[in-house]
Amino acid sequence: MEPVLTEREKMVTGLRYRFEDPELDQLRLRARRLNKQFNNLIGSDEDDGKKGPEIIKQLFGSTGEIVIVREGIKVSYGVNIHVGDKFFINHNCILNDDGPIRIGYGAMIGPNSQLYTATHPFEPSERIGGSDENFTKGITIGDNFWGGGNVIILPGVTLGNNVIVGAGSVVTKSFPDNSIIAGNPAKLIRMNIPTK
């Protein structure tokens, strides 16, 4: 007999799941509260430079030691976000982490960028009325990533180490290590082989 998976387990593994679920409702509420707490703190008189990173460590599933997050961040669950050490994300970014978002060491994400893992059936009858039939495709980003401002990364994308994404790009497919990509949809501009 196959094990019965929770809606959360289905969600993070890319299986179809019901969005309206008590456990998922609680996780979304927790994320909204921590999100609000963080965004209200940054730049306020109470911002001592220590409380913000503590909130992010509570909000994200896992983080490296040095994590810098600017104000205006929005997440769906938070717990499905895993970032490496020396991670930087600029202001007003959206991390739609219905599915896992994994980002390696030394990543930099520009302002107003968006990472989406949620997707929906192509069949119209399966989407009508906000159907419970949702599914996810995780995003994986390697070490030393640099994404310019207003970058959008769509569900299921994997980007290798040392990838650079030009500002305003929409990344619809995966690219290997050392790729420099840009455009809508993003295309390979050239390879960037590190010299050090």
From Swiss-Prot:
This is Putative acetyltransferase DDB_G0275507. It comes from the Eukaryota. It comes from Dictyostelium discoideum. Its EC number is 2.3.1.-. Belongs to the transferase hexapeptide repeat family. Gene3D superfamilies: Hexapeptide repeat proteins. GO terms for molecular function: acetyltransferase activity; O-acyltransferase activity. InterPro entries: Hexapep, Hexapeptide_acetyltransf, Mac_dom, Trimer_LpxA-like_sf. Keywords: Acyltransferase, Transferase.
